[in-house]
Amino acid sequence: MLKPLENRVVLRVKEEEEKSMGGIVLTSASQEKPQTAEVVAVGEGKTNHHGTLISPLVKVGDTVIFEKFAGTTVKMDGEEFLILKDSDLLAIVE
Protein backbone atom coordinates (compact mmCIF):
# COMPACT_ATOMS: atom_id res chain seq x y z
CA MET A 1 0.00 0.00 0.00
CA LEU A 2 1.04 3.60 -0.48
CA LYS A 3 2.11 5.65 2.54
CA PRO A 4 1.92 9.37 1.72
CA LEU A 5 4.56 11.77 3.02
CA GLU A 6 3.97 15.03 4.88
CA ASN A 7 0.61 16.65 4.04
CA ARG A 8 -0.28 14.38 1.14
CA VAL A 9 -3.28 12.05 0.90
CA VAL A 10 -3.96 9.01 -1.26
CA LEU A 11 -7.41 8.84 -2.86
CA ARG A 12 -9.35 6.09 -4.64
CA VAL A 13 -11.32 7.99 -7.25
CA LYS A 14 -14.96 7.00 -7.51
CA GLU A 15 -15.58 6.21 -11.17
CA GLU A 16 -19.20 6.57 -12.17
CA GLU A 17 -20.79 5.56 -15.44
CA GLU A 18 -21.78 8.78 -17.13
CA LYS A 19 -24.95 9.10 -19.15
CA SER A 20 -26.16 11.99 -21.23
CA MET A 21 -29.51 13.67 -20.59
CA GLY A 22 -31.00 11.30 -23.19
CA GLY A 23 -29.66 8.20 -21.42
CA ILE A 24 -26.73 7.52 -23.78
CA VAL A 25 -23.63 6.11 -22.05
CA LEU A 26 -20.72 8.48 -22.67
CA THR A 27 -17.23 7.27 -23.60
CA SER A 28 -14.38 8.02 -21.22
CA ALA A 29 -13.04 10.67 -23.63
CA SER A 30 -16.28 12.68 -23.39
CA GLN A 31 -16.74 12.36 -19.62
CA GLU A 32 -15.80 15.01 -17.07
CA LYS A 33 -12.91 14.00 -14.80
CA PRO A 34 -14.37 12.78 -11.46
CA GLN A 35 -13.80 15.01 -8.46
CA THR A 36 -15.11 12.75 -5.70
CA ALA A 37 -12.92 10.13 -4.02
CA GLU A 38 -12.41 8.02 -0.91
CA VAL A 39 -9.39 8.74 1.29
CA VAL A 40 -7.34 5.53 1.61
CA ALA A 41 -4.18 6.91 3.29
CA VAL A 42 -3.14 10.14 5.02
CA GLY A 43 0.35 11.53 5.67
CA GLU A 44 1.57 12.67 9.10
CA GLY A 45 1.16 16.35 8.26
CA LYS A 46 3.56 19.20 7.67
CA THR A 47 5.37 21.49 10.08
CA ASN A 48 4.77 25.22 9.88
CA HIS A 49 7.49 27.87 10.18
CA HIS A 50 7.23 27.67 14.00
CA GLY A 51 7.96 23.92 13.95
CA THR A 52 4.41 22.93 14.91
CA LEU A 53 3.02 19.84 13.15
CA ILE A 54 -0.19 20.63 11.27
CA SER A 55 -2.15 17.39 10.76
CA PRO A 56 -4.43 16.91 7.73
CA LEU A 57 -8.14 17.48 8.43
CA VAL A 58 -9.23 14.26 6.67
CA LYS A 59 -9.03 10.64 7.78
CA VAL A 60 -9.06 7.27 6.06
CA GLY A 61 -12.59 6.45 4.89
CA ASP A 62 -13.68 10.06 4.30
CA THR A 63 -15.29 10.90 0.97
CA VAL A 64 -13.85 14.13 -0.38
CA ILE A 65 -14.18 16.54 -3.28
CA PHE A 66 -10.88 17.69 -4.76
CA GLU A 67 -9.54 20.23 -7.27
CA LYS A 68 -10.26 19.14 -10.83
CA PHE A 69 -6.69 18.82 -12.13
CA ALA A 70 -4.86 18.22 -8.84
CA GLY A 71 -2.51 15.42 -7.93
CA THR A 72 -0.57 12.61 -9.53
CA THR A 73 -2.19 9.39 -10.73
CA VAL A 74 -0.43 6.18 -9.65
CA LYS A 75 -1.25 2.56 -10.55
CA MET A 76 -0.51 -0.12 -7.96
CA ASP A 77 -1.70 -3.74 -7.82
CA GLY A 78 -4.09 -3.13 -10.72
CA GLU A 79 -5.77 -0.19 -8.98
CA GLU A 80 -5.51 3.50 -9.76
CA PHE A 81 -4.91 6.04 -7.00
CA LEU A 82 -4.50 9.80 -6.86
CA ILE A 83 -1.87 11.37 -4.60
CA LEU A 84 -2.31 15.05 -3.78
CA LYS A 85 -1.69 17.64 -1.09
CA ASP A 86 -4.41 18.14 1.51
CA SER A 87 -4.67 21.77 0.38
CA ASP A 88 -6.06 20.47 -2.96
CA LEU A 89 -9.08 19.04 -1.11
CA LEU A 90 -12.15 21.25 -1.26
CA ALA A 91 -14.64 19.52 1.04
CA ILE A 92 -15.53 16.42 3.03
CA VAL A 93 -18.83 14.85 1.96
CA GLU A 94 -20.98 14.07 5.02
From Swiss-Prot:
Domain of life: Bacteria
InterPro entries hit by this protein: Chaperonin_GroES, Chaperonin_GroES_sf, Chaprnonin_Cpn10_CS, GroES-like_sf
CDD domains listed in its UniProt record: cpn10 (cd00320)
PROSITE patterns: CHAPERONINS_CPN10 (PS00681)
Gene3D superfamilies reported in the protein's UniProt record: GroES chaperonin
Keywords on record: Chaperone, Cytoplasm
Single Gene Ontology BP annotation: chaperone cofactor-dependent protein refolding
SMART domains xref list: Cpn10
Pfam families reported in the protein's UniProt record: Cpn10
GO MF assignments: ATP binding; metal ion binding; protein folding chaperone; protein-folding chaperone binding; unfolded protein binding
GO cellular component: cytoplasm
Subcellular location: Cytoplasm
General function of this protein: Together with the chaperonin GroEL, plays an essential role in assisting protein folding. The GroEL-GroES system forms a nano-cage that allows encapsulation of the non-native substrate proteins and provides a physical environment optimized to promote and accelerate protein folding. GroES binds to the apical surface of the GroEL ring, thereby capping the opening of the GroEL channel.
Stored PANTHER family: 10 KDA HEAT SHOCK PROTEIN, CO-CHAPERONIN GROES
Similarity section: Belongs to the GroES chaperonin family.
NCBIfam families cross-referenced by the UniProt entry: PRK00364.2-2 (NF001531), PRK00364.2-4 (NF001533), PRK00364.2-5 (NF001534)
Subunit structure as annotated in this protein's UniProt entry: Heptamer of 7 subunits arranged in a ring. Interacts with the chaperonin GroEL.
HAMAP family the UniProt entry points to: CH10
Name of the protein described by the UniProt record: Co-chaperonin GroES
Gene source species: Lactococcus lactis subsp. lactis (strain IL1403) (Streptococcus lactis)
